[in-house]
Curated annotation (Swiss-Prot):
Function recorded in the entry: This protein is involved in the repair of mismatches in DNA. It is required for dam-dependent methyl-directed DNA mismatch repair. May act as a 'molecular matchmaker', a protein that promotes the formation of a stable complex between two or more DNA-binding proteins in an ATP-dependent manner without itself being part of a final effector complex.
Protein name per UniProt: DNA mismatch repair protein MutL
Any Pfam family matching the protein: DNA_mis_repair
Family membership noted in the UniProt record: Belongs to the DNA mismatch repair MutL/HexB family.
Swiss-Prot/TrEMBL keywords: DNA damage, DNA repair
GO annotation (BP), single: mismatch repair
Domain of life: Bacteria
GO MF annotation list: ATP binding; ATP hydrolysis activity; ATP-dependent DNA damage sensor activity; mismatched DNA binding
Length: 594
């Protein structure tokens, strides 16, 4: 077959295959056009998730009749006046959206500029159907119906109306977050799904479109390096989700789903979230136009940075700095909903009455605030349980002090510390909290030149498979800087001579086995310092006090005081909360007083 020029309608359909993948793709292009037109309010109406109809109306600058006709031709645009694609500042610039949509759907455009009459033009799958005067306020209205009706090969790949509607909602959310100065309305089958007013604060806009509790469970991000700025809202690590749908990333006001940015976010949260949990976050990167290429993807959802290392480092560093300021904060969402399942019961019978002072509780004088150095300089290791010290397990409770984490009142199931604060009741998971404290202490020690070692009285032999031993052997020098002294002991064993002093009397065998497993997931080209958080987290887990360990009140208060001054103490190394608080109002609700 000889080479021939394709007809215009077929060219448009091919182009539409790249630009218009589903109703959400068409909606994105239309709303971006409205934003570029200077609209202050944008209204969207959907039918059957956009499969039947998409209506977009705005109060932007509008178009003249000649401009409407020109807008339906390929590569006709008003957004590149100087043909400087490297310095593009608008969301659209190729001039492909309207002709592409018009080639695979029934498209009607109504528009009016201020001081002139309105005009409409209708195109059905690339064929002009009609045009003429139209009555409408200044701005533009566009209706897309019967998408892919004459392209069955494409329509059969569309998903259900519910799935397509969800994709459309995601598009509007992202664009609305990018432009809090614009008001957005989304209706589906006559029901209003989104309504946000113009000129909102960014944090309020993000919270309104994601989770109302985000404002109370997030930190502001504001970081600058050279000509690049990073702003936004980052949820606390304990305020997480099981899917990554609540991560919103923007570059120069453009919503993107860029792997570099997603990886940077994951890196910033890596030791604060479990692998199957994801942060709630909205980040806005602003940088000069010549430092980023937005013309690398048909839908413009991916970008390419001139200096990706700078951007990634900035995101990781900026998020880390913001999360450090959160200190010991954890999710403040009341736990009353979960506790509401409790049923009020009658008084216990005589046979079931518990002792006046349960064995699982230990009361005593509260520890004083520490002076110079760490609280743990005074309580380096947990002291024996009260029974082992031959001292009374009960003494009058201390006076309530103005400590953010409260004063320890007891221990439940030898696992949870119960503390009384001025504004409620604090419950702390002792293992999770101590695990975070040990990790942060190891980080500080590494930053100061290395972790002190604690020699074992009798070196311990740990048997592993040969591959695991090989991995550990290649990292012996690096592990030594972290306080772990190893040497090869035959083909399938490692000899442990010293462990990090910070870990105390931990499970040496379990630590070595877990480290070997961690190293199996590493790129051999990376040093352990580049994976410090992973290695230190593994060590900290084995060096922290376990659930089931009875603590004295002094030990509990020492832990609470260090939590108050330690970054990220609100979540453990796996992203779980280390403490929760029940406010006085929450407790009163449980007892029906409110």
């Amino acid at each position: 077959m000889s080479i021939r020029r394709l007809p215009e309608h077929l060219v448009n359909r091919i182009a539409a295959g790249e630009v218009v993948e589903r109703p959400a793709s068409a909606l994105k292009e239309l709303v971006e056009n409205s934003i570029d037109a200077g609209a202050r309010r944008i209204s969207v109406s959907l039918s059957e998730g956009g499969l039947s109809a998409i209506d977009v109306a705005d109060d932007g600058c509008g178009m003249t009749p000649d401009e409407i006709a020109l807008a339906l031709e390929r590569h006709a645009t008003s957004k590149l006046p100087d043909d400087a694609i490297e310095a593009v500042t608008t969301l659209g610039f190729r001039g492909e959206a309207l002709p592409s949509i018009g080639s695979v759907a029934d498209l009607t455009i109504e528009s009016r500029v201020r001081g002139a009459d309105g005009w409409h033009r209708r195109v059905d799958h690339g064929e002009l159907v009609g045009e003429g005067p139209a009555a409408l306020p200044p701005g533009t209205r566009i209706r897309v119906s019967n998408l892919f009706a004459k392209v069955p090969a494409r329509r059969k790949f569309l998903r259900s109306a519910r799935a397509e509607y969800a994709a459309c909602v995601d598009v509007i959310k992202r664009l609305a977050m990018a432009r809090p100065d614009i008001g957005f309305t989304l209706e589906h089958e006559g029901r209003r799904a989104i309504l946000v007013a113009p000129d909102e604060q960014r944090v309020d806009r993000v919270a309104a479109l994601t989770d109302r509790d985000l404002a109370q469970n997030s930190v502001a991000v504001d970081f600058r390096r050279e000509a690049v700025s990073l702003t936004g809202v980052a949820g606390l690590p304990t305020f997480n989700r099981g899917v990554a749908d609540h991560q919103f990333l923007f570059v120069n006001g453009r919503p993107v789903k860029d792997r570099l940015l997603i990886g940077a976010v994951r890196g910033a949260y890596q030791d604060m979230l479990a692998r199957d949990r994801h942060p709630v976050i909205a980040l806005f990167v602003e940088l000069p136009g010549d430092q980023v290429d937005v013309n690398v993807h048909p839908a413009k959802t991916e970008v390419r940075f001139r200096d990706p290392g700078l951007v990634r480092g900035m995101i990781v560093g900026g998020l880390r700095a913001a999360l450090d300021e959160a200190g010991h904060r954890s999710v403040q969402r009341p736990s009353v909903a979960a506790l509401g399942n409790w049923q009020a019961g009658g008084l216990p019978t005589a046979s079931s009455t518990a002792p006046a002072i349960p064995n699982g509780f230990a009361f005593g004088a509260a520890a004083e605030r520490s002076g110079q150095g760490s609280v743990w300089d005074r309580v380096a290791d947990f002291a024996p349980a009260p029974m082992a010290r031959a001292e009374p397990a009960y003494s009058p409770p201390p006076q309530q002090a103005s400590y953010p984490m409260g004063v320890a009142r007891g221990q439940v199931a030898a696992t949870y510390i119960v503390a009384e604060a001025e504004d409620g009741l604090v419950i702390v998971d002792q293992h999770a909290a101590h695990e975070r404290l040990v990790l942060e202490r190891m980080r500080r020690a590494m930053a100061d030149g290395g972790v002190a070692r604690q020699a074992l009285l009798l070196p311990e032999v740990v048997e592993l498979d040969e591959v695991g031993c090989d991995r550990l052997e290649t990292r012996i020098a690096e592990l030594a800087e972290m306080g772990l002294e190893l040497e090869r002991f035959g083909p399938k064993a490692m000899l442990v001579r010293a462990t990090p002093a910070l870990l105390g009397q931990g499970d040496v065998h379990g630590l070595i086995v877990d480290l070997a497993d961690e190293l199996a997931a590493y790129d051999e080209a990376l040093s352990l310092k580049e994976r410090l958080d992973h290695v230190a987290a593994t060590m900290a887990c084995h060096g922290s006090v376990r659930a089931g360990r009875t603590l004295s009140v002094a030990e509990m208060n020492a832990l609470l005081r260090e939590m108050e001054v330690t970054p990220h103490s609100g979540q453990c190394n796996h992203g779980r909360p280390t403490w929760i608080k029940l406010g006085h109002g929450d407790i009163e609700k449980l007892f029906g007083r409110k």
